[in-house]
Structures are given as structure tokens and as C-alpha cells.
Amino acid sequence: MEVDCRVISRGKGRGPVLVSTEPLSFLGGVDPGTGRVIDQKHPLHGRSIRGKVLLIPGGKGSTVGSYVIFQMAKNETAPAAIICLNAEPIIATGAIMAGIPMVDRPSEDLLGLLEDSMEVEVDADEGKIRF
């Protein structure tokens, strides 16, 4: 299936999808050294986002979260791509700085279509999500 979306940060990323219905804060919520979600109240707690296509409603928290995403890219612990239902400036800035493909506003209800570990491709050059 192919879903249209808005491009935030260009590039292509592919991998198993990691789905959350809760927004994620990268500052204090994700360990940039390992790529694991460390926010104990988040549904993804203990899971690694490294090399995954991360599907979240959006981000939350401090603007320093952008730099956490950038540090994750430097540490090679970043997601392969990010899909937000509605992007906000913190994650968008981090993805752009880190060169992580990112899209938002999918034309279909991805939370109803995608399940953890499904193989997903984000083509943030063309504005397409394929699975």
C-alpha cells in the first residue's frame, strides 16, 4: 500500500515500524547513547527506536529534544525515519538537523493500518509511505 504525506525532512528510510499512540519527548524520554525509550510512563518504555521507522502522533517537551535527535544520529542510535501524525517544531528541527527522513499528515489512518514490526518505507523525497 502507498500513502501520501507531507515532507518535513527529505531522504528515504526503511525498517520495521515501531508504533505509539502517545507523543514522545526525546529530552529525558530517550537515551541518545542506546536509542532506548527511558520514559517509564511511555508505552514504548524499554524499546529501542534505533534503525526503526518511528510512528508517533507528535512530540512533546523541551526544545533541547532537537539536539537529542541530532546526537542520536551522531551516535548511530537514531530511527531510520520518523512519521508523525502532526509534526511539531521540536522533532521536525531535530530530524532536519540530523538528516533523518521525516513526514507527517498521512492521508490514511496509519495507527489503524500499521502494527509493530511491519516493514515500512518512508520516501520523504516523494512524500510517500509504503508498506
Swiss-Prot record:
Q: What is its EC number?
A: 4.2.1.182
Stored CDD domains? AcnX_swivel (cd01356)
Q: In which pathway does it act?
A: Isoprenoid biosynthesis; isopentenyl diphosphate biosynthesis via mevalonate pathway
Give the matching InterPro entries: PMDh-S-like, PMDh-S-like_dom, PMDh_S
- Cross-referenced Gene3D superfamilies, in alphabetical order? Phosphohistidine domain
Taxonomically, which superkingdom?
Archaea
GO biological process, any? isopentenyl diphosphate biosynthetic process, mevalonate pathway
Q: Tell me, how does this one assemble?
A: Heterodimer composed of a large subunit (PMDh-L) and a small subunit (PMDh-S).
Q: What is this protein called?
A: Phosphomevalonate dehydratase small subunit
Supply the source organism's classification.
Archaea, Methanobacteriati, Methanobacteriota, Methanomada group, Methanobacteria
